[in-house]
């Protein structure tokens, strides 16, 4: 088992994970969180299912596991961070967009190795791909505001 934040290369791979591998890890983690929202299947079962049912050869597996497990483990805390920035009750947020902003909140809080602009951009791109027509605007707004709270030194104008 890996620890949260472990980004060591996967067996058979050398060096740092590629951006595309992390992008795919984020997308799969978001889909796993979405599935969990509806099925209440244990997160370990969802992780195992995704590992079997998807081509993981171009996925940063450690990052996928960190995101999936971390967001699940800290969901209540992440929701408390997000709620002040929401324009509606949490239960009314589209499940895809909710999974994306939870994922982004986790990355902003725990993955300091990922620049806040990357976290926001990746969230926007996932919302465009998987969310509703205007979902990317919602995701952008929430993650931008949250980044100013969690990454003050990084977001402060110079």
Swiss-Prot record:
Keywords per UniProt: RNA-binding, Transcription, Transcription antitermination, Transcription regulation
Comp. bias (Polar residues): 1-13
GO molecular function terms noted in the UniProt entry: RNA binding
Region: Disordered, residue numbers: 1-24
Extent of the signal sequence: none
Family to which the UniProt record says this protein belongs: Belongs to the NusB family.
Protein name as catalogued: Transcription antitermination protein NusB
Organism expressing this protein natively: Marinobacter nauticus (strain ATCC 700491 / DSM 11845 / VT8) (Marinobacter aquaeolei)
